[in-house]
């Protein structure tokens, strides 16, 4: 994956509304189509949406998630397996423009609707906000 927060400040991409269902809770977020987001599911080759960690916090209140928890996704993985086994959480390797890489917590939501169409993809949760000014909460790879 190659997405960098500094590069996002120069975005001119399209925004879209995404409705996702996680742990039985439905949330609508704004996503940016980001051609620089090349993160793929290593098992299927499918697209991965990168989202703010706060989406996971809001949909899974039983985790009592804090931003500092996202710095160690390995530890959070076990907590998620116990509290929300149906989400089938996993770790996803990534690399950014400004970072050598690491692991992101990822899971497959029950449902994702993009422009009214149901999609199947993983959501990986960023330990920092993906938007430079709060205009969106997620990144979708490719173009609309």
Where do the language-model regions lie?
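Surface-exposed beta-strand edges and their flanking turn/coil or helix-capping segments
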Residues: 43-47, 62-65, 134-141
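Surface-exposed loop/turn and secondary-structure junction residues enriched for glycine/proline
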Residues: 42, 52-53, 59, 97-100, ...
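Aspartyl protease catalytic core from the pepsin/retropepsin fold
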Residues: 18-21, 25-35, 68-144
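Long, charge-rich C-terminal accessory regions
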Residues: 50-76
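Canonical alpha-helical transmembrane segment with a positive-inside/aromatic-interface signature
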Residues: 1-42, 47-50, 57, 69
């Amino acid at each position: 994956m190659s997405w960098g927060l500094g590069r996002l400040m120069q975005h001119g991409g399209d925004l879209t509304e995404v409705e996702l269902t996680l742990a039985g809770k439905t949330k609508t977020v704004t996503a940016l189509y980001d051609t620089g987001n090349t993160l793929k599911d290593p098992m299927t080759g499918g697209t991965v949406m990168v989202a703010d960690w706060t989406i996971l916090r809001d949909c899974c209140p039983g985790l009592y998630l804090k931003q500092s928890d996202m710095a160690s996704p390995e530890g959070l993985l076990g907590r998620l397996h116990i509290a929300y086994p149906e989400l089938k959480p996993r770790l996803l390797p990534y690399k950014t423009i400004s970072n050598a890489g690491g692991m992101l917590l990822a899971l497959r939501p029950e449902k994702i609707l993009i422009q009214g169409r149901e999609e199947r993809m993983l959501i990986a949760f960023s330990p920092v906000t993906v938007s430079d000014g709060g205009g969106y909460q997620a990144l979708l790879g490719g173009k609309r």
